[in-house]
Amino acid sequence: ASLHEVCPEHADPAERADRIRGEQFAERLRDDLRQERWLYDFMLAYHSDVRDSARAATAALEGRTPLSNHDLLVQAYRATQYREGARRRATYDELVSTGSLGLIADQRMLGAAAQLYRIRTIDNLVLESLQSPYRREFRMSVDSDVQRQLARACGDRYIRPGDYAGMGEVLGFPCKIELPPAAIDAAAEGLRSNPALLRALRLRLADLETRMVDFTGNNREVFQALHEVTGDPP
C-alpha cells in the first residue's frame, strides 16, 4: 500500500467520526427522499383524480356532456377535494443549518435533494385548493345533509404512507349517495343554476391542470432524479 493510503481503522479520529456521521446522515436522507417520492407520486395520482372530476363536472354544467344528477353531485364534490402531506426534509435542513453537506459522499443524492426541496409544487397545490373559490361556493350552495352523505359515501379512503398499491383507490372509486331522489335532484339543480359556481369551477380546473403540468412536465427531471436515487418502491 502507498505511504499516503490510510486504512479506515488507522484514520484520524476526527475524519473517522465525520465518515460515520456522513453515513448516518446519508441513510436518514435517503429514507426522507423515499418518503418524499411516495408523497409526490401519491399527490400526482390523487389530484389527477380530482382534476378528472373537475373536468367531468365542468363538461356537465356547460352542457357538453350529459351527467345524471347523482353523478354530477359526486363529480362536483370530488372536484373540491385536496390532500396535504407531511414533508420529510428535517435531515436536509439539519445538514444545511450545521454546515454538514460536505459529509454526504453521494453527490447525486445530495443534488436530487437540493432540487426537490427548492420546488413548491405541493405547497402551491395545497394553497390553491384551500383558497379555491369553487370549494367555498360548493359548500355554500349544497345542503349540509347532502354534503355529509357525499363525504361519507364518496370521500377519501385512508391510505397508509408508503402504500403504492392503494393510490388509485383513495378517491376515484365508484360510490352511491344514499339520499331520496328529490334531495339529490334539488342539490344538483342548485349547482346547474349557479353561474358563479361554474366560473369558480373553471378556475379550479385551470389551477389543477397547471399543477399537473408542474408534476409531469416542468419538474420531470427533479422527479426522475428522485426515482433514480431512491430505487424501486417496495
Walk through the language-model features, giving the residues of each.
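Long, hydrophobic alpha-helical segments that serve as membrane-spanning/inserting helices
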Residues: 6-234
